[in-house]
A protein has these predicted regions:
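Phosphate- and other anionic-substrate recognition elements at nucleic-acid/protein interfaces
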Residues: 1-190
């Protein structure tokens, strides 16, 4: 799992030879970008992107705002896990998740930490049947180093590294690699 509030994603593999990807967009997107993502879903059946639309986090009071944020966080996490479960066909399940980076500040960091906690709890309950021995949490720099990128690499660097030198050879011919090669500019600039 690569978690973010606006675009969390997961890679699913049973054998490190075949891969499926799921993602949830959780922000307002232009009609043209929505159409673009729908096209990706059609062109690459092993990639499944769900759009939740624009978040509504503003309430009339502090309590109302926090309730709306929590509703949005629960919808985001449950939609992501529901989508993953449609692609998982074997047990036991092993889950790797990227730990959060501390680049965010203030309330956005609090929201990321809170939502990541909800995600971990949901993974425990719904994917791992509360058996946490199947959960592995990696620091962002560990994951970047594992693919051959620098620990402080940004998303563009990670995309480039994945396209140019995937560490799992089968990933070179995966739907995600083909999609990134074909639509890299559209994906990283939107």
């Amino acid at each position: 799992f690569d978690f973010s509030i606006n675009f969390p994603a997961a890679c699913i593999s049973h054998d490190f030879k075949t891969f499926k990807w799921v993602a949830v967009t959780n922000t307002k997107l232009s009609k043209s970008y929505l159409h673009f993502l729908e096209g990706i879903n059609l062109e690459f059946p092993d990639i499944h992107i769900v759009n939740l639309g624009e978040k509504n986090n503003k309430g009339a009071s502090y309590s109302d705002t926090e309730r709306k944020k929590l509703q949005n966080q629960l919808l985001l996490v449950n939609t992501l896990i529901d989508t993953v479960l449609t692609k998982v066909t074997q047990k036991p399940i092993i889950v790797g998740i990227e730990g959060f980076a501390y680049g965010a500040k203030g309330n956005s960091l609090v929201d990321i930490v809170q939502t990541t906690g909800i995600l971990k709890k949901t993974i425990s309950d719904r994917l791992l049947d509360k058996n946490l021995s199947g959960l592995f949490i990696f620091s962002p720099s560990e994951l970047k180093n594992a693919i051959g990128a620098k620990g402080n690499a940004n998303k563009f660097d990670v995309f480039n590294q994945f396209i140019e030198d995937p560490k799992i050879e089968a990933a070179r011919d995966s739907a995600l690699a083909k999609c990134l090669n074909k639509y890299k500019t559209e994906l990283v600039t939107s």
